Amino acid sequence: MFKFTFALALCVLAAGSALAQHNPHWWGNRNTIVHLFEWQWEDIAEECENFLGPRGFAGVQVSPANENIVSPGRPWWERYQPISYKLITRSGDEEQFADMVRRCNDVGVRIYVDVLLNHMSADFYGQAVGTAGTEADPATKSFPGVPYTAEDFHPSCQIYDWNDRFQIQQCELVGLKDLDQSRDHVRTKLIEFLDHLIELGVAGFRVDAAKHMASEDLEFIYGSLSDLKTEHGFPHNARPFIFQEVIDHGGQEVTREEYNSLGAVTEFRFWQEIGNAFRGNNAFKWLQSWGTDWGFFSSGQAFTFVDNHDNQRDGGAVLTYKIPRQYKMATAFHLAYPYGISRVMSSFAFDDHDSAPPQNAQEQLISPEFDSDGACVNGWICEHRWRQIYNMVGFKNAVRDTPVTNWWDNGDSQIAFCRGSKGFIAINNNLYDLAETLQTCLPAGVYCDVISGDLIHGSCSGKSVTVGNDGRAFVSIGSNDFDGVLAIHVDAKL
């Protein structure tokens, strides 16, 4: 009986720990993460203080923080080829990283680190040197900066069959040296690395290439991590938030369901379907059932996005900053509809798949610069600073925990809906105007359309919407308007 009771207790503790790893530890009503892709730590700290905190962003996903290989031309993907776990990259050193985390936490913006637990660097022609000056020999699987030797890796093989579990989880993803996470030494080093980041105050991790690691190995690693630190504003016994990259479009051997009990999982079907709809290939009327009815994960397990740093370079159905009108519309719907753990992208401009982030002649990352409207101008795109996006972050905060009500559509691709009595949004993706009197569910008054303008000192710089005593308002979105969206909420009342 004692053995049974003890085993049952362990199972309950494990289940509770896994459930806790779905909690992103946001402040107040904040509930949107932004990926500041390839930004420097000092610039992120300033962005937290000057923009993200005041605008109500919940957190930042940052690029990998540990030492990576130095590759000719400095392509973005060098950050995904680890050399050691020293916290020195082109984004900054450990002191700068720690300062960023502290300053962002102080203004209610959590930090989530992109971490690479699956692999180390691929083969490199010539001497492989990292961003901290550490030398390695990937060809012989020698990484003295950790240290790892050949026995810490799976035998080299390539992935040819994406329905072969062995190949997916033990062969080398695009030549990257595949760590054996079942080995005690590898587990210890990975846990030490993650615990060090926790000690510095991070709130959690994006786990790159999670499907290429056995879920039981990840369960052990996650379960061995320290609690988040109370001195950084986290409650006692808080577990790090885990969101895992698991690419699963259906019908594959390794599935997302193997990982969702361990933490949130990237919902890749979300971006496919939202891209398909907002490119005009699916009528918006079907979006009324958005979420699990579309085959998506349950909302609390799904990490959602319109695009990410990988797929925006791959073409296809994905929407990116290069199609700005549809991209803003899709992002507005993403942030208005109550489904998933939302992340928005903040990119740099690129012409080809391997383009480096903005850098100077010495190959040092450069800081973003801003025009008089606050938009980035020197190679950084900064979608999170587009009015149509940052104001929808505010909308999402204002309507948090309210349901979709009073759905309206025209039988095609003009839609509108309320979020309880807190907010209202209308979207027009037809080639003709939307001009309707619709139920907004809001108290009577005049509201600022946060898509076309900002509410500044009681005045709206864009369109205003008058709501009558019955909650109804005339809504107009022309087919050729600059934006195909209108959004109002209780915090945007004049």
From Swiss-Prot:
Keywords: Calcium, Carbohydrate metabolism, Chloride, Disulfide bond, Glycosidase, Hydrolase, Metal-binding, Pyrrolidone carboxylic acid, Secreted, Signal. Residues 1-20 form the signal peptide. It comes from the Eukaryota. It holds the Pfam family Alpha-amylase. Its EC number is 3.2.1.1. One of its GO terms (cellular component) is extracellular region. It is found in: Secreted. Disulfide bonds join C48-C104, C157-C171, C376-C382, C418-C441, C448-C460. Coiled coil: none annotated. The modification Pyrrolidone carboxylic acid is found at Q21. Its cofactor is Ca(2+); chloride. GO terms for molecular function: alpha-amylase activity; metal ion binding. It catalyses: Endohydrolysis of (1->4)-alpha-D-glucosidic linkages in polysaccharides containing three or more (1->4)-alpha-linked D-glucose units. SMART domains: Aamy (SM00642), Aamy_C (SM00632). Gene3D superfamilies: Glycosidases, Golgi alpha-mannosidase II. InterPro entries: A-amylase/branching_C (IPR006048), A-amylase_C (IPR031319), Alpha_amylase (IPR006046), Glyco_hydro_13_cat_dom (IPR006047), Glyco_hydro_b (IPR013780), Glycoside_hydrolase_SF (IPR017853). Chloride binds at R206, N308, R343. Belongs to the glycosyl hydrolase 13 family. This is Alpha-amylase-related protein.
